């Protein structure tokens, strides 16, 4: 009976422990569920501190936990040693002007916020700690005593050396506590004779026993005398402390301007503060004493301009009375960065055409054209160039104007996006097999000359029927080519008289340059180079098809510029050019990017 009862107790104990462990492991999940349930299904605007020994609820707008993390580096110590931290705390029982934040001593040294601090010619803090967050000045004599107590009780040499060195740095250059500093200086000299410089790698990594040092007893005696002497001075150490001057509230932060308001503290009324002086300077610099902003107690809102974007500035405020300087506070602020890429303003100025329709301005039209190559617009540019070649530019614009002046239809059918017809002679097929100009065999821009001659000399009625069925229309003996409008981005149909002349010399066709814009030259050159790379075996047909489709349909202005740069720079080295294009654009051309900018993969 005794053994069975013992087993049952052990089993019950194990079950209880498992339940307890599960309860502790699910604390985070339960906290999240409580956050959801407590808000009626809405998440609370807070997050839980990652420190296992803290687990405090931190407001969402805070970047670090103010309860356990350093206000300078925003990190926490898992095994926190309070003697290695500085805290902004009240010096008196009735002191309410403090923020309560803490920081590592080493972080305070790095930011020059502890020890003997010279704030220009304005103020000099001797043996004090200036809070990194609010600027409140506190004494460090208590922290200095903690270092000597830890040094006296240290059992390892590295710990002893570090604590003595820390106590020496805290009061280095002091005039108020020179007697205490001389005691630590003597202990430091003794240790350096044995282990070398206290801030060197030898002393910091020496894990030897302290009792085996010949000077260990003398160093411990010096620590004891220094601690006793500090206790006598601590009662009068707070007489020269500087209280906080004010609180800062940044109302607006811009790239080159900051608007802030100084919040007055209760001590300002008690001690009859007359006004405030403000210095602002870049982090790491020192302010000039005569360059400050003076403001009274009634006008505490200031706008600071002529700042540099994306720069951290320090704002230092000193309150003054009739007797002189009274309080000191400081705060840091990062100015915002400047947006290089600005969104297109939909309310940009537009020009008005002949019939009163709003047309995009020249700047907007150029930006729209350069953003991507539209196949429909490409066909329009090609026909415009052909009209210039044949001297029919005036007829082209006359027909276009007549088309615009026609009364609009009551309801236009919905336009099919990218529903262009590659059979229309005005729209070239970018993926069609490329034929060099020297082997064109009597064709001009991919259009057989004999077919045009037959169209001019054939039967009028039959040819008109065939032309209309193929998306073209003929009038009299001249073939008037009209696009069906499905591929034109601007949605207009145009007529153009085409009169082809047989060209005996095939090299002349290559000399006809398109003067419409540099965009067409870039596209034409890139297409020729890509086809040339395919014929030479440097790229595959699949990559060529996808690349040209992407380049003409979806590429942005920046991507087009990159491709053009690659082509112009590496044109003499086809292997390097092909490798660069494949490496840079394989993922891009394999991704479908609709016109609305949403990325959808295959």
Curated annotation (Swiss-Prot):
Gene name as annotated: VIL1
Q: Which InterPro entries does the record associate with it? A: FN3_dom, FN3_sf, Ig-like_fold, Oberon-like_PHD, VIN3-like, VIN3-like_C
Q: What happens when the gene is disrupted?
A: Impaired vernalization response with incomplete repression of FLC during and after cold exposure, due to a reduction in vernalization-induced histone H3 deacetylation and methylation (e.g. H3K4me3 and H3K27me3). Delayed flowering in short days (SD=8 hours light/16 hours dark) conditions but not in long days (LD=16 hours light/8 hours dark); enhanced FLM levels dur to an enhance level of chromatin acetylation.
| Name by which UniProt lists this protein | VIN3-like protein 1
Q: Which domain of life is it from?
A: Eukaryota
Matching PROSITE patterns, A to Z? FN3 (PS50853)
Q: Where is the composition biased (Basic residues)?
A: 9-22
How is expression of this protein distributed across tissues? Accumulates in shoot and root apices, and in leaves.
Record keywords, A-Z: Flowering, Metal-binding, Nucleus, Repressor, Transcription, Transcription regulation, Zinc, Zinc-finger
Q: Which organism is it from?
A: Arabidopsis thaliana
Q: What does this protein do?
A: Involved in both the vernalization and photoperiod pathways by regulating expression of the related floral repressors FLOWERING LOCUS C (FLC) and FLOWERING LOCUS M (FLM). Together with VIN3, required during vernalization for the modifications of FLC and FLM chromatin that are associated with an epigenetically silenced state (e.g. chromatin modifications, histone deacetylation, and trimethylated H3 'Lys-4' H3K4me3 and 'Lys-27' H3K27me3) and with acquisition of competence to flower. Promotes flowering in short days (SD=8 hours light/16 hours dark).
Q: Where does this one sit in the cell?
A: Nucleus; Nucleus speckle
